[in-house]
Protein backbone atom coordinates (compact mmCIF):
# COMPACT_ATOMS: atom_id res chain seq x y z
CA UNK A 1 0.00 0.00 0.00
CA UNK A 2 1.32 3.43 -0.93
CA UNK A 3 1.98 5.92 1.86
CA UNK A 4 0.86 9.56 1.65
CA UNK A 5 1.94 12.76 3.36
CA UNK A 6 -0.56 14.68 5.42
CA UNK A 7 -0.38 17.51 2.87
CA UNK A 8 -1.36 15.14 0.07
CA UNK A 9 -4.29 13.84 2.10
CA UNK A 10 -5.38 17.38 2.96
CA UNK A 11 -5.45 18.24 -0.74
CA UNK A 12 -7.48 15.13 -1.55
CA UNK A 13 -10.04 15.93 1.15
CA UNK A 14 -10.04 19.72 0.64
CA UNK A 15 -9.21 19.88 4.35
CA UNK A 16 -7.67 22.59 6.48
CA UNK A 17 -4.29 21.27 7.63
CA UNK A 18 -3.03 22.15 11.08
CA UNK A 19 0.32 20.54 11.81
CA UNK A 20 3.18 18.85 9.97
CA UNK A 21 2.28 18.50 6.29
CA UNK A 22 5.36 16.35 5.63
CA UNK A 23 4.18 13.70 8.09
CA UNK A 24 3.94 10.31 6.33
CA UNK A 25 0.70 8.36 6.87
CA UNK A 26 0.87 4.59 6.53
CA UNK A 27 -2.58 3.45 7.63
CA UNK A 28 -6.10 4.49 8.66
CA UNK A 29 -7.12 3.31 12.12
CA UNK A 30 -9.65 3.90 14.87
CA UNK A 31 -8.87 6.39 17.60
CA UNK A 32 -8.62 3.55 20.13
CA UNK A 33 -6.15 1.41 18.16
CA UNK A 34 -4.14 3.93 16.13
CA UNK A 35 -0.36 3.99 16.44
CA UNK A 36 2.48 6.15 15.15
CA UNK A 37 2.10 6.79 11.41
CA UNK A 38 -1.64 6.17 11.52
CA UNK A 39 -4.46 8.63 10.83
CA UNK A 40 -7.77 8.33 12.69
CA UNK A 41 -11.06 10.22 12.51
CA UNK A 42 -13.79 11.42 14.87
CA UNK A 43 -17.29 11.17 13.38
CA UNK A 44 -19.31 10.75 16.59
CA UNK A 45 -18.94 13.08 19.56
CA UNK A 46 -19.49 10.25 22.04
CA UNK A 47 -15.91 9.17 21.22
CA UNK A 48 -14.52 12.68 21.74
CA UNK A 49 -12.77 11.66 24.97
CA UNK A 50 -10.55 9.32 22.92
CA UNK A 51 -8.90 12.37 21.35
CA UNK A 52 -7.03 12.89 24.63
CA UNK A 53 -5.46 9.42 24.64
CA UNK A 54 -5.19 8.35 21.00
CA UNK A 55 -1.74 7.45 19.70
CA UNK A 56 -2.67 8.50 16.14
CA UNK A 57 -0.16 10.74 14.37
CA UNK A 58 -3.04 12.73 12.87
CA UNK A 59 -6.80 12.95 13.21
CA UNK A 60 -9.60 14.01 10.85
CA UNK A 61 -12.06 16.19 12.79
CA UNK A 62 -14.87 18.66 12.29
CA UNK A 63 -14.40 22.33 13.09
CA UNK A 64 -16.45 21.86 16.27
CA UNK A 65 -14.19 19.04 17.51
CA UNK A 66 -10.86 20.54 16.42
CA UNK A 67 -10.21 22.34 19.76
CA UNK A 68 -10.30 18.99 21.59
CA UNK A 69 -7.20 17.66 19.80
CA UNK A 70 -3.80 19.33 20.01
CA UNK A 71 -1.91 17.18 17.50
CA UNK A 72 -1.74 17.12 13.71
CA UNK A 73 -5.24 17.42 12.33
CA UNK A 74 -7.28 17.81 9.18
CA UNK A 75 -10.41 19.92 9.66
CA UNK A 76 -13.29 19.00 7.35
CA UNK A 77 -17.04 19.53 7.10
CA UNK A 78 -17.91 15.83 7.40
CA UNK A 79 -15.25 13.56 8.95
CA UNK A 80 -17.09 10.35 8.07
CA UNK A 81 -17.32 11.24 4.37
CA UNK A 82 -13.65 12.26 4.43
CA UNK A 83 -12.76 8.92 6.02
CA UNK A 84 -14.67 7.14 3.24
CA UNK A 85 -12.76 9.01 0.54
CA UNK A 86 -9.42 8.36 2.20
CA UNK A 87 -10.27 4.68 2.64
CA UNK A 88 -10.87 4.45 -1.11
CA UNK A 89 -7.41 5.91 -1.71
CA UNK A 90 -5.69 3.51 0.72
CA UNK A 91 -7.83 0.45 -0.04
CA UNK A 92 -5.90 -2.83 0.05
CA UNK A 93 -8.70 -4.97 -1.44
CA UNK A 94 -7.51 -6.78 -4.61
CA UNK A 95 -8.56 -4.72 -7.60
CA UNK A 96 -9.61 -7.68 -9.70
CA UNK A 97 -12.03 -10.52 -9.11
CA UNK A 98 -10.43 -12.19 -12.13
CA UNK A 99 -7.85 -11.47 -14.84
CA UNK A 100 -8.22 -12.61 -18.43
CA UNK A 101 -10.35 -15.64 -19.24
CA UNK A 102 -9.27 -18.64 -17.20
CA UNK A 103 -8.71 -21.86 -19.21
CA UNK A 104 -11.22 -23.72 -17.02
CA UNK A 105 -14.03 -21.22 -17.66
CA UNK A 106 -16.84 -22.54 -19.87
CA UNK A 107 -18.21 -19.89 -22.24
CA UNK A 108 -21.04 -20.83 -24.62
CA UNK A 109 -20.24 -20.11 -28.28
CA UNK A 110 -23.34 -17.93 -28.54
CA UNK A 111 -22.38 -15.77 -25.56
CA UNK A 112 -20.92 -12.32 -26.22
CA UNK A 113 -17.94 -11.51 -24.00
CA UNK A 114 -16.00 -8.26 -24.36
CA UNK A 115 -12.27 -8.60 -24.98
CA UNK A 116 -11.67 -6.48 -21.88
CA UNK A 117 -13.81 -8.69 -19.61
CA UNK A 118 -12.24 -11.10 -17.11
CA UNK A 119 -13.69 -14.53 -16.32
CA UNK A 120 -12.46 -16.55 -13.32
CA UNK A 121 -11.75 -20.25 -12.96
CA UNK A 122 -14.64 -22.73 -13.34
CA UNK A 123 -17.14 -20.01 -14.22
CA UNK A 124 -19.93 -20.94 -16.64
CA UNK A 125 -21.48 -18.46 -19.07
CA UNK A 126 -24.54 -19.71 -20.92
CA UNK A 127 -25.95 -19.01 -24.39
CA UNK A 128 -26.83 -15.45 -25.44
CA UNK A 129 -25.35 -13.89 -22.32
CA UNK A 130 -23.81 -10.46 -22.94
CA UNK A 131 -20.78 -9.51 -20.86
CA UNK A 132 -19.75 -5.92 -21.54
CA UNK A 133 -16.44 -4.03 -21.28
CA UNK A 134 -14.32 -4.36 -18.15
CA UNK A 135 -16.69 -6.74 -16.40
CA UNK A 136 -14.99 -9.01 -13.84
CA UNK A 137 -16.57 -12.33 -12.90
CA UNK A 138 -14.93 -14.23 -10.06
CA UNK A 139 -14.30 -17.98 -9.96
CA UNK A 140 -17.04 -20.61 -9.68
CA UNK A 141 -19.78 -18.24 -10.80
CA UNK A 142 -22.74 -19.05 -13.05
CA UNK A 143 -24.15 -16.65 -15.64
CA UNK A 144 -27.41 -17.94 -17.09
CA UNK A 145 -28.86 -17.80 -20.57
CA UNK A 146 -29.66 -14.32 -21.88
CA UNK A 147 -28.10 -12.45 -18.95
CA UNK A 148 -26.83 -8.92 -19.62
CA UNK A 149 -24.08 -7.42 -17.46
CA UNK A 150 -23.14 -3.76 -17.94
CA UNK A 151 -19.65 -2.36 -18.25
CA UNK A 152 -17.41 -2.14 -15.21
CA UNK A 153 -19.52 -4.43 -13.04
CA UNK A 154 -17.65 -6.76 -10.69
CA UNK A 155 -18.88 -10.14 -9.40
CA UNK A 156 -16.84 -11.83 -6.70
CA UNK A 157 -16.67 -15.63 -6.43
CA UNK A 158 -19.60 -18.07 -6.43
CA UNK A 159 -22.17 -15.57 -7.70
CA UNK A 160 -25.19 -17.04 -9.48
CA UNK A 161 -27.15 -15.02 -12.05
CA UNK A 162 -30.21 -16.82 -13.43
CA UNK A 163 -31.53 -16.52 -16.98
CA UNK A 164 -32.52 -13.18 -18.54
CA UNK A 165 -31.45 -11.06 -15.57
CA UNK A 166 -30.15 -7.60 -16.48
CA UNK A 167 -27.46 -5.90 -14.39
CA UNK A 168 -26.34 -2.33 -15.08
CA UNK A 169 -22.92 -0.73 -15.16
CA UNK A 170 -20.44 -0.31 -12.30
CA UNK A 171 -22.27 -2.65 -9.93
CA UNK A 172 -20.63 -4.77 -7.24
CA UNK A 173 -21.97 -8.20 -6.27
CA UNK A 174 -20.31 -9.87 -3.31
CA UNK A 175 -19.64 -13.60 -3.00
CA UNK A 176 -22.49 -16.12 -2.99
CA UNK A 177 -25.18 -13.63 -3.98
CA UNK A 178 -28.00 -15.16 -6.05
CA UNK A 179 -29.95 -13.03 -8.51
CA UNK A 180 -33.04 -14.25 -10.35
CA UNK A 181 -33.93 -17.44 -8.50
CA UNK A 182 -37.60 -18.42 -8.39
CA UNK A 183 -39.96 -16.33 -6.33
CA UNK A 184 -42.03 -18.16 -3.72
CA UNK A 185 -45.15 -18.66 -5.84
CA UNK A 186 -47.53 -21.59 -5.29
CA UNK A 187 -51.24 -22.30 -5.53
CA UNK A 188 -52.97 -24.78 -3.23
CA UNK A 189 -55.38 -27.31 -4.68
CA UNK A 190 -56.96 -29.61 -2.07
CA UNK A 191 -53.82 -29.66 0.06
CA UNK A 192 -51.38 -30.02 -2.81
CA UNK A 193 -48.96 -27.22 -3.67
CA UNK A 194 -48.85 -26.34 -7.38
CA UNK A 195 -45.72 -24.45 -8.39
CA UNK A 196 -46.28 -21.21 -10.29
CA UNK A 197 -43.47 -20.64 -12.80
CA UNK A 198 -41.88 -17.25 -12.24
CA UNK A 199 -42.02 -15.65 -15.67
CA UNK A 200 -40.58 -12.24 -14.84
CA UNK A 201 -36.94 -11.38 -14.30
CA UNK A 202 -34.72 -9.10 -12.21
CA UNK A 203 -33.59 -5.71 -13.50
CA UNK A 204 -30.74 -4.02 -11.62
CA UNK A 205 -29.68 -0.44 -12.38
CA UNK A 206 -26.24 1.17 -12.35
CA UNK A 207 -23.90 1.49 -9.34
CA UNK A 208 -25.83 -1.00 -7.24
CA UNK A 209 -24.00 -2.95 -4.51
CA UNK A 210 -25.33 -6.30 -3.30
CA UNK A 211 -23.90 -8.00 -0.22
CA UNK A 212 -22.66 -11.53 0.28
CA UNK A 213 -25.30 -14.30 0.32
CA UNK A 214 -28.12 -11.91 -0.54
CA UNK A 215 -30.89 -13.31 -2.74
CA UNK A 216 -33.11 -11.37 -5.13
CA UNK A 217 -35.98 -13.39 -6.61
CA UNK A 218 -37.30 -13.00 -10.12
CA UNK A 219 -40.81 -11.65 -10.63
CA UNK A 220 -43.87 -13.82 -11.07
CA UNK A 221 -45.07 -11.89 -14.13
CA UNK A 222 -43.59 -8.39 -13.87
CA UNK A 223 -39.92 -7.91 -13.05
CA UNK A 224 -38.27 -7.40 -9.69
CA UNK A 225 -36.52 -4.02 -9.99
CA UNK A 226 -33.56 -2.60 -8.08
CA UNK A 227 -32.96 0.95 -9.28
CA UNK A 228 -29.58 2.69 -9.58
CA UNK A 229 -27.47 3.66 -6.55
CA UNK A 230 -29.12 1.18 -4.18
CA UNK A 231 -26.93 -0.57 -1.60
CA UNK A 232 -28.01 -3.89 -0.06
CA UNK A 233 -26.11 -5.55 2.78
CA UNK A 234 -25.35 -9.24 3.37
CA UNK A 235 -27.93 -12.01 3.78
CA UNK A 236 -30.97 -10.02 2.70
CA UNK A 237 -34.00 -11.62 1.02
CA UNK A 238 -35.69 -9.59 -1.71
CA UNK A 239 -38.81 -11.45 -2.85
CA UNK A 240 -40.53 -11.48 -6.24
CA UNK A 241 -41.91 -8.27 -7.74
CA UNK A 242 -40.24 -6.01 -5.18
CA UNK A 243 -39.19 -2.56 -6.39
CA UNK A 244 -36.46 -0.63 -4.56
CA UNK A 245 -36.01 2.94 -5.76
CA UNK A 246 -32.75 4.86 -6.13
CA UNK A 247 -30.57 5.92 -3.23
CA UNK A 248 -32.01 3.44 -0.73
CA UNK A 249 -29.83 1.48 1.72
CA UNK A 250 -30.92 -1.88 3.18
CA UNK A 251 -28.96 -3.37 6.10
CA UNK A 252 -28.22 -7.05 6.73
CA UNK A 253 -30.77 -9.83 7.21
CA UNK A 254 -33.68 -7.66 6.09
CA UNK A 255 -36.61 -9.37 4.37
CA UNK A 256 -38.81 -7.63 1.80
CA UNK A 257 -41.81 -9.84 1.04
CA UNK A 258 -43.41 -10.09 -2.39
CA UNK A 259 -44.55 -6.94 -4.22
CA UNK A 260 -43.13 -4.50 -1.66
CA UNK A 261 -42.24 -1.06 -3.03
CA UNK A 262 -39.55 0.99 -1.32
CA UNK A 263 -39.22 4.68 -2.20
CA UNK A 264 -36.15 6.77 -2.92
CA UNK A 265 -33.45 7.54 -0.35
CA UNK A 266 -34.80 5.27 2.37
CA UNK A 267 -32.70 3.60 5.07
CA UNK A 268 -33.84 0.21 6.36
CA UNK A 269 -32.14 -1.13 9.48
CA UNK A 270 -30.92 -4.69 9.89
CA UNK A 271 -33.31 -7.61 10.41
CA UNK A 272 -36.33 -5.55 9.38
CA UNK A 273 -39.28 -7.46 7.90
CA UNK A 274 -41.74 -5.75 5.55
CA UNK A 275 -45.00 -7.53 4.83
CA UNK A 276 -46.05 -8.33 1.27
CA UNK A 277 -47.70 -5.71 -0.96
CA UNK A 278 -46.74 -2.84 1.38
CA UNK A 279 -45.29 0.43 0.08
CA UNK A 280 -42.84 2.78 1.77
CA UNK A 281 -42.65 6.37 0.56
CA UNK A 282 -39.47 8.35 -0.16
CA UNK A 283 -37.20 9.47 2.66
CA UNK A 284 -38.19 6.92 5.31
CA UNK A 285 -35.82 5.55 7.97
CA UNK A 286 -36.83 2.23 9.56
CA UNK A 287 -34.79 1.24 12.60
CA UNK A 288 -33.39 -2.27 12.99
CA UNK A 289 -35.56 -5.29 13.81
CA UNK A 290 -38.77 -3.46 12.91
CA UNK A 291 -41.83 -5.24 11.54
CA UNK A 292 -43.76 -3.26 8.94
CA UNK A 293 -47.32 -4.50 8.46
CA UNK A 294 -48.88 -1.37 6.95
CA UNK A 295 -47.77 0.95 4.18
CA UNK A 296 -45.80 4.05 5.21
CA UNK A 297 -47.01 7.20 3.47
CA UNK A 298 -45.17 9.96 5.36
CA UNK A 299 -41.37 10.48 5.53
CA UNK A 300 -39.85 10.07 8.98
CA UNK A 301 -38.26 7.58 11.36
CA UNK A 302 -40.23 4.43 12.22
CA UNK A 303 -39.54 1.73 14.81
CA UNK A 304 -41.14 -1.35 16.34
CA UNK A 305 -40.18 -4.20 18.63
CA UNK A 306 -39.25 -4.46 22.30
CA UNK A 307 -35.69 -3.43 23.28
CA UNK A 308 -33.75 -5.90 25.38
CA UNK A 309 -33.96 -5.96 29.16
CA UNK A 310 -33.26 -8.53 31.85
CA UNK A 311 -35.19 -11.76 31.53
CA UNK A 312 -36.95 -11.01 34.81
CA UNK A 313 -38.18 -7.61 33.62
CA UNK A 314 -39.13 -9.00 30.21
CA UNK A 315 -41.31 -11.69 31.82
CA UNK A 316 -43.10 -9.05 33.88
CA UNK A 317 -43.72 -6.91 30.80
CA UNK A 318 -45.06 -9.84 28.78
CA UNK A 319 -47.40 -10.79 31.64
CA UNK A 320 -48.81 -7.25 31.61
CA UNK A 321 -49.04 -7.32 27.81
CA UNK A 322 -51.22 -10.43 27.92
CA UNK A 323 -53.58 -8.68 30.34
CA UNK A 324 -53.94 -5.43 28.38
CA UNK A 325 -57.50 -6.18 27.26
CA UNK A 326 -58.63 -6.91 30.81
CA UNK A 327 -56.80 -3.84 32.13
CA UNK A 328 -58.48 -1.65 29.51
CA UNK A 329 -61.92 -2.92 30.58
CA UNK A 330 -61.15 -2.25 34.24
CA UNK A 331 -59.93 1.28 33.50
CA UNK A 332 -63.06 2.03 31.47
CA UNK A 333 -65.21 0.75 34.34
CA UNK A 334 -63.35 3.01 36.80
CA UNK A 335 -63.80 5.98 34.48
CA UNK A 336 -67.54 5.32 34.36
CA UNK A 337 -67.69 5.21 38.18
CA UNK A 338 -65.89 8.54 38.45
CA UNK A 339 -68.13 10.37 36.00
CA UNK A 340 -70.17 13.14 37.69
UniProtKB/Swiss-Prot annotation:
It catalyses: a UDP-3-O-[(3R)-3-hydroxyacyl]-alpha-D-glucosamine + a (3R)-hydroxyacyl-[ACP] = a UDP-2-N,3-O-bis[(3R)-3-hydroxyacyl]-alpha-D-glucosamine + holo-[ACP] + H(+). Keywords: Acyltransferase, Lipid A biosynthesis, Lipid biosynthesis, Lipid metabolism, Repeat, Transferase. InterPro entries: Hexapep, LpxD, Trimer_LpxA-like_sf, UDP_GlcNAc_AcTrfase_non-rep. Its EC number is 2.3.1.191. GO terms for cellular component: membrane. Pathway: Bacterial outer membrane biogenesis; LPS lipid A biosynthesis. Catalyzes the N-acylation of UDP-3-O-acylglucosamine using 3-hydroxyacyl-ACP as the acyl donor. Is involved in the biosynthesis of lipid A, a phosphorylated glycolipid that anchors the lipopolysaccharide to the outer membrane of the cell. This is UDP-3-O-acylglucosamine N-acyltransferase. It comes from Pseudoalteromonas translucida (strain TAC 125). The gene is lpxD.
